[in-house]
Amino acid sequence: MTNKARLRFAPSPTGQIHIGNIRTALFNWLYSRHIDGEFILRVEDTDMNRSVEEYEQIIFRALSWLGLDWDEGPQKGGDFGPYRQSERKDIYHKYANKLLEAGKAYYCYCTEEELEEMREAQRARGEMPRYSGKCADLSSEERAELENEGRKSVIRFKVPENQTIRVNDLVKGEVDFESDGIGDFILIKSDDMASYNFACVVDDYLMNITHVLRGEDHLSNTPKQVMIYEALGFETPEFGHLSLILGPDKAKLSKRHGDTFIGEYREKGYLPEAMVNFLALLGWSPPGEDELFTQDELIRLFDIGRVSKSAAVFDVDKLNWMNSHYIKEADTERLLNLSKEYLINSDLVSQEQLEHDWEWFVSAVDLVKEKIDMLSELPPQLKIFYGDDVDLKGEEVEFLEKDHVPELLSEVINQFNDLDSFEDPKAIKKAVNKAGKQVGVKGKQLFMPVRIAVSGQMHGPELDQLISLLGRERAINRVNSTLSQIQS
């Protein structure tokens, strides 16, 4: 083993990447950076029928989007490659042969039908289904006969009897497993590829992995892996199993709770810094009461000893609050760049118009960004700047029925026409105040009618900035439209 801590994230490219997997990647990445270790990415594509290169690329993009850079792995290389299990078949066979030669593994020729009959018989006897060891002591003649029948073989690990396997888990503490409850399991499958448990052990050893942090759904694999480590004479890494992520109803997080794939959050316009902050707090608690952390702060604070044994609850309201905070704090030009697709797909603006009026759009987004939880909500907020007519409804109409409103709005139009420039919000504010002075109103009786007249809403962005961005012509047209409606 190396003196430097080495952690890995080893996803399978068999589908979209789940929030739980990304949380696992994040914890491994944070801990490796916290202890000045190395973070390795390994693709576990031993399931040749389900592994798809497109999903591999999705994994790479998700990690890169979140800023989880890897020191070794696909696209980057390293001294311990290759980093795809499908490219390491010969390595697995080398170690499987060592176990065969040592009498710690054997060839099994049982068909799926025979295995199912075995399981049914065990269930009928009230036993836990597991492999019976039927092929464990086949002679070379018996093996040859089965092979002549055209049977395909697998290689099974010979599980030691009456053995307690103790795992000192970094999160769960001491966990004991009894070998008698574990049947002889497969090391090399009939397609000649290593099983998950075997490939995982060989790779973790050869890649000098010192810490294995993964979801608690892998806890049941751990005794099998520990037995393989011991059978091969390998040093065992430290294991830590992370609690499940639950939905608000305390059931395991699934599609019925909403989005569960990281790509869906990116598509909706969540910022990577918000996702990292939020996911870091799913099962880990920093010291103190703060909940908002930069990536550097998370690296400095992350301690495996503060990872909870209890399941974490995915609270989308908290995520939305966190994302809205990061949107407010973000550079507005960056937000606009990230929002181009939403704006163009909403038919609010063309690519050409967006490029031509870029500075105007930056100002408009800056004005409304505090109203949104995610960037996909931006187009409806920007609609306030479009159109010359105002659609008045109940409460707004009632407020405009006050006697002073027609005179006030007429004076506002006069003041707008008298302005030398419409680009200075301060000048617009003075013009509105001047109109109020002429009519003899101030405060709510002044600003609310003007706001409703230019936006159709009783609440919204800073009034003077809103009017400035509307421009003189559109602002005056809207006030005239409002006057026409209340005077008709």
UniProtKB/Swiss-Prot annotation:
A motif ('HIGH' region) lies at residues 11-21. A motif ('KMSKS' region) lies at residues 252-256. The keyword Ligase applies. The keyword Nucleotidyltransferase does not apply. It catalyses: tRNA(Glu) + L-glutamate + ATP = L-glutamyl-tRNA(Glu) + AMP + diphosphate. Keywords: Aminoacyl-tRNA synthetase, ATP-binding, Cytoplasm, Ligase, Metal-binding, Nucleotide-binding, Protein biosynthesis, Zinc. It is an enzyme of class 6 (ligase). InterPro entries: aa-tRNA-synth_I_cd-bd, aa-tRNA-synth_I_codon-bd_sub2, aa-tRNA-synth_I_CS, aa_tRNA-synth_I_cd-bd_sf, Glu-tRNA-ligase_bac/mito, Glu/Gln-tRNA-synth, Glu/Gln-tRNA-synth_Ib_cat-dom, GluQ/Sye. ATP binds at residue 255. It comes from the Bacteria. Its EC number is 6.1.1.17. Zn(2+) binds at residues 108, 110, 135, 137. GO terms for biological process: glutamyl-tRNA aminoacylation. Monomer. Belongs to the class-I aminoacyl-tRNA synthetase family. Glutamate--tRNA ligase type 1 subfamily. PANTHER family: GLUTAMATE--TRNA LIGASE, GLUTAMATE--TRNA LIGASE, MITOCHONDRIAL-RELATED. Catalyzes the attachment of glutamate to tRNA(Glu) in a two-step reaction: glutamate is first activated by ATP to form Glu-AMP and then transferred to the acceptor end of tRNA(Glu). This is Glutamate--tRNA ligase. The lineage of its organism: Bacteria, Bacillati, Bacillota, Clostridia, Natranaerobiales.
